[in-house]
Amino acid sequence: MKVNEENNKPTKTHVLIFPFPAQGHMIPLLDFTHRLALRGGAALKITVLVTPKNLPFLSPLLSAVVNIEPLILPFPSHPSIPSGVENVQDLPPSGFPLMIHALGNLHAPLISWITSHPSPPVAIVSDFFLGWTKNLGIPRFDFSPSAAITCCILNTLWIEMPTKINEDDDNEILHFPKIPNCPKYRFDQISSLYRSYVHGDPAWEFIRDSFRDNVASWGLVVNSFTAMEGVYLEHLKREMGHDRVWAVGPIIPLSGDNRGGPTSVSVDHVMSWLDAREDNHVVYVCFGSQVVLTKEQTLALASGLEKSGVHFIWAVKEPVEKDSTRGNILDGFDDRVAGRGLVIRGWAPQVAVLRHRAVGAFLTHCGWNSVVEAVVAGVLMLTWPMRADQYTDASLVVDELKVGVRACEGPDTVPDPDELARVFADSVTGNQTERIKAVELRKAALDAIQERGSSVNDLDGFIQHVVSLGLNK
């Protein structure tokens, strides 16, 4: 640690954190920042960049840790983003590329802030949607809120730019022979960002270059752990040409059960409801912060839950606006399942629910945060991937880790209610191989974040490396 010559006190190593404004991206990076601040202690000074309307996501962290401060920059306007919108949660799924492109306009303000700062950051840790931050004149660490295998696939897509043989066939299989286990997916199951790419369009060329900058960044931090994805972490090191890849997961909240937004049911009520149920007898249903089921899917899922006879908690994201193709749960459902079903409209205290002894299975869209939280809880996953990296996550969960069972797949698929009912009933009875594997993986996950565990060692290694960057300036 350097010493300030004026007061003879050690100079802290300054690190800038830049989350991407979407719940599934902000939450894990802010949780990582919390751990970084606690573990780094007096060695680190941390600044977190947010736009004004995203400050509430950061506020709990600012009140919990003293060596973190905010950098609030105005949101850069974009012609296709409504005025006042600064987070992807207020946009349809198609809003991701708009947000990526808009945030690229923070390059000049960031350069100005860095060059004028009396003690500028020696490094930046930014979300993998913000690859352009590699070009700020300081070492940039790519933070992946997704699985290591997803990083492998995204790198291959944006560097090699594979295309379909038959442009009209979305069922065509895309192979990744250079990646361990040679994964393959239908073309409609790979990144929608990649599938939407338009050659020569300036906005899309910016996004392509940004993803390519991830591979060329100084280092990579992944929300995973060696026992779960070691083979993919080693592949990333070979691909990037160095060992500056740190697996610091599972990144889980140190506190807070209701960080994501308003909910129709209090956390205390949810916990009391679960307390009255037997161990491993409740199915938890949640599709994350972005997915709104179609009316037909909602009806099929409600029917499957009703027919199954299982106890369940269903966290429902309802449409922001009236939409004839997307429906709410029909009136009367709550009454028909009263006593064995609890419907939460809005944000659910997912971490607390999954960790409760009564929860035995989790119907999930396979967003990586949800997968990680289920792994830490040791809960059997029932997979229903719909988009983005969810197909990759589902394949990892079911085919490789064997801690899940397929329930359905696809954003528009309407499942058979009777088949869903069978899957639900089977998931909370007996000791399936998948349930046993889930318990074993939970132990490996918890071991990784214990003192001298693989992820704690990687976190310490990351901190030491960042501090060394400050010493060498």
From Swiss-Prot:
It catalyses: a flavonol + UDP-alpha-D-glucose = a flavonol 3-O-beta-D-glucoside + UDP + H(+); a 7-O-hydroxy-flavonol + UDP-alpha-D-glucose = a flavonol 7-O-beta-D-glucoside + UDP + H(+). The active site is at H25, D127. Keywords: Glycosyltransferase, Transferase. It holds the Pfam family UDPGT. UDP-alpha-D-glucose binds at A348, Q350, H365, W368, N369, S370, E373, D389, Q390. An anthocyanidin binds at H25, A388. InterPro entries: UDP_glucos_trans. One of its GO terms (molecular function) is flavonol 3-O-glucosyltransferase activity. Its EC number is 2.4.1.91, 2.4.1.237. It comes from the Eukaryota. CDD domains: GT1_Gtf-like. Belongs to the UDP-glycosyltransferase family. Possesses quercetin 3-O-glucosyltransferase, 7-O-glucosyltransferase and 4'-O-glucosyltransferase activities in vitro. Also active in vitro on benzoates and benzoate derivatives. This is Flavonol 3-O-glucosyltransferase UGT89B1. It comes from Arabidopsis thaliana. The gene is UGT89B1.
